[in-house]
């Protein structure tokens, strides 16, 4: 993250642009987030997984900034992870559960020294999240 902004293209950043070009922003977000490329690019990747283990040691201002960023990410994810018939609270709960699975898989994949297992973690989570969301 540079100056608080991601440098890599992500459907999180501009869902309407992905929809305008005929893409499913949820499917693209899942595929991008749970990719070996994102796993390898720690410096420019998701700050939620990059700083999660250290955030409690930050001063109150740093902790507040992390919390604001996480809330913003969850809000963006809830926008692209909509499902018919869900109320606002249900949509947010669904987004939190899905994003938590994705972040946990990315974190575990980054921590594992065995490349085959690291890939298996990403592949399993990607398949599960796609099946639970119906994302293409």
Features from the language model and the residues they span:
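Short alpha-helical scaffolding segments that buttress acidic/His motifs in well-ordered protein cores
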Residues: 29, 33, 48-52, 98-102
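Hydrophobic/aromatic-rich alpha-helical bundle segments in the mid-to-C-terminal region
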Residues: 24, 59-68, 81-136
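Active-site oxyanion/phosphate-handling segment shared across diverse enzymes
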Residues: 70-80
């Amino acid at each position: 993250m540079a100056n608080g902004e991601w440098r890599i293209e992500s459907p999180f950043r501009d869902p309407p642009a992905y929809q305008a070009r005929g893409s499913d922003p949820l499917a693209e977000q899942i595929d991008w987030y749970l990719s070996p490329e994102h796993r390898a690019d720690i410096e420019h990747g998701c700050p939620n997984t990059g700083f999660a283990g250290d955030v409690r040691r930050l001063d109150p201002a740093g902790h507040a900034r992390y919390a604001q960023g996480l809330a913003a990410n969850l809000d963006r994810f809830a926008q692209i992870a909509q499902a018919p018939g869900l109320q606002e609270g249900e949509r947010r709960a669904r987004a939190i559960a899905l994003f938590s699975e994705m972040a946990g898989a990315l974190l575990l994949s980054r921590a594992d020294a065995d490349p085959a297992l690291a890939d298996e973690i990403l592949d399993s989570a990607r398949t599960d999240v796609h099946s639970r969301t119906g994302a293409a």
